Amino acid sequence: MTEPSIDIPKESSKSILFQFVLFPLGIVAVGVGIFLLFGRLASEEHTIPDYLNEIRAGSSHERWQAAYQLSKSLKRGEAKRYPNLEEQVASIYRGSKNDDPRIRQYLSMVLGTIGDHRATPVLLEALNDRETETRIYALLALGELKDPAAVPRMVEAARDGDKDVRKTAFFALGEIHDPSAVDVLVSGLEDRVADVRWNAAIALAQFSDRRAAPVLRTMLDRTMLARIPDMREDQKEDALIVGMTVYPKLVGAEARPELERIATSDPSLRVRDAAKQALAALR
């Protein structure tokens, strides 16, 4: 596992799962650096039509920056103020196939936030893109759309040769929660890459399928985590916390011995606190 995890926020288990399982280094680095490098767009007052116009007609740098700002500015439900927004964004998306890939990547986020299933075919087409990160963003957006029609193609993505694509596909399939994905989620439990297995197990656990339990339990085992090449200490803590979020919900009181062990003996205060919270939730 070579990509770093993002700093994990304290707000909710949902945030922890989302932040931990996704975003390889290239995506994170771009997102973190944008405000430092390109503050002009952020500091000016822009409306959604302004961003759309800049994406259409700006310079190469201005276009992807505007796409990023639009993805950050648009709130779920706000699209109702702009009846043709999905159509406009989808049109720009289709026309930007040969442009800076960041334009399509950030517009994928916009389409996901809009939440209109008419965007599903556009995003499914993006799963054929040569850019790995573009495929990842499209999968994330499809997970947000929760359109069952996307599941067959996303199942194919779960068998992709790139581990980050597989990882994201499993996460997004869990978001859609369509029973037709269960078989591929089960197959993902045997993936050769640890965090791909974890994503498959996390998604499968949402179906209350106990076949996910053995893989989830490995996330609570520091000895097992120590065998994963290049895994940093903070990533190990992240895995433990995510595992303690999901595993007890699946197996109930069976998780108590593991949680008690972690709560009393883990070297990380952050992990011990998470174990105590998980124990309290069992009571």
List each language-model region with its residue ranges:
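Extracytoplasmic/periplasmic/luminal assembly and interaction segments
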Residues: R56-S60, W64-I114, K163, F171, ...
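Structural signature of alpha-helical solenoid repeat scaffolds
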Residues: S71-K72, G112, G143, G174, ...
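Amphipathic alpha-helical scaffolding segments comprising HEAT/armadillo-like alpha-solenoid repeats
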Residues: L41-E54, R76-G95, D116-N128, D147-R159, ...
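Hydrophobic membrane-insertion alpha-helices, especially the h-region
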Residues: Q19-G39
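Short inter-helical turns and helix N-cap capping residues of alpha-solenoid HEAT/ARM repeat scaffolds
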Residues: G58-S59, D99-D100, R130-E131, G161-D162, ...
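Acidic, Ser/Thr- and Gly/Pro-rich intrinsically disordered linkers and low-complexity segments
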Residues: R102, L220-A239
